[in-house]
A protein has these predicted regions:
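A feature for loop-to-transmembrane-helix boundaries and adjacent hydrophobic helices
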Residues: 1-273
Length: 273
């Protein structure tokens, strides 16, 4: 058990310069930058594998478009699903990314769109690109959840103050659900995908495994995470929007994983990624 120290979300300020500023640099943005940088390093190393259809010269563009898709999709998805009333009251709120508020599922759709377009550009199948990208997205997910923790947002439900996992927030003992998600969606997801993709795998299999592992981790953490205030529980007094969006990911992931390995078994010299 420990007491949450209420971090200052602003890491440092620059300026004012030439009458503008000061420019506030927030931990939330820094964490995303660190996540993308680590993903870039890992992806460049992986691209050097002899079987990889994605070459090192593609990695810079891929990371740029992943970041663009994740940020735009994540922010738009969050505001449409969780903060629509806020957008109606203040349309400019959608651009205030530094204040927090990113939806994984929106960001996921943004990345899918960006990688589909980039795959067409380099003339590679969609799942070849996504299989390459999947393990390295875990760095961004981990960094984003640490950013949530620093911002003091997305806390878990109350728990016993005597519990070893309890974090005291404003006098209440709570689950640090952001750290649970950082572990499951970051550390566990990366290790599973990295170990699995260290040798050639059937096209689509790594992407499918991403859907399964992320979906299961998110679904489980939702049981101890406070539901979004705007939505509350959707059904049965415990079903959350996060679970509703994660369940299809798990189902689709299982189907794609089976299909990928079945095709590899049936087709000699089937494509690998």
């Amino acid at each position: 058990m420990f007491t949450y120290p209420h971090f200052n979300p602003v890491a440092f300020s620059i300026g004012p310069l030439f009458g503008f500023g000061p420019l506030e640099v927030r931990w939330y943005g820094i964490m995303y930058l660190v996540g993308f940088a680590l993903g870039w390093l890992g992806a460049r190393s992986h691209a050097k594998q002899p079987w990889s259809k994605i070459k090192p010269e593609h990695v810079d563009d891929i990371v740029f478009y992943v970041a663009l898709g994740a940020i735009i999709g994540g922010r738009v998805g969050y505001m449409l699903i969780y903060g629509f009333s806020e957008v109606i009251a203040d349309p400019l709120a959608i651009f205030k990314v530094w204040q927090g508020g990113m939806s994984f599922h929106g960001g996921f759709l943004g990345v899918l769109t960006a990688m589909w377009l980039y795959g067409r550009h380099i003339k590679q199948p969609f799942f070849v690109v996504m299989d390459f990208v999947a393990p390295w997205t875990a760095f961004g997910l981990f960094a984003g959840r640490i950013g949530n923790f620093i911002n003091g947002e997305l806390w878990g439900k109350t728990t016993s103050p005597d519990a070893p996992w309890a974090v005291i927030v404003d006098g209440q003992a709570r689950h640090a659900s952001q750290l649970y998600e950082a572990f499951l969606e970051g550390v566990v997801l990366f290790l599973v995908l990295w170990l699995y993709s260290r040798k050639p795998r059937p096209v689509m299999a790594t992407s499918a495994l991403f859907l399964i592992v992320y979906g299961v981790g998110r679904f489980l953490v939702e049981f101890v995470r406070v539901p979004d205030q705007q939505l509350g529980y959707l059904a049965l007094g415990w079903v959350t929007m996060g679970q509703v969006l994660s369940l299809p990911m798990i189902i689709v992931g299982v189907i794609l994983f089976v299909l990928a390995h079945r095709r590899a078994a049936e087709v000699p010299n089937a494509a690998v990624s």
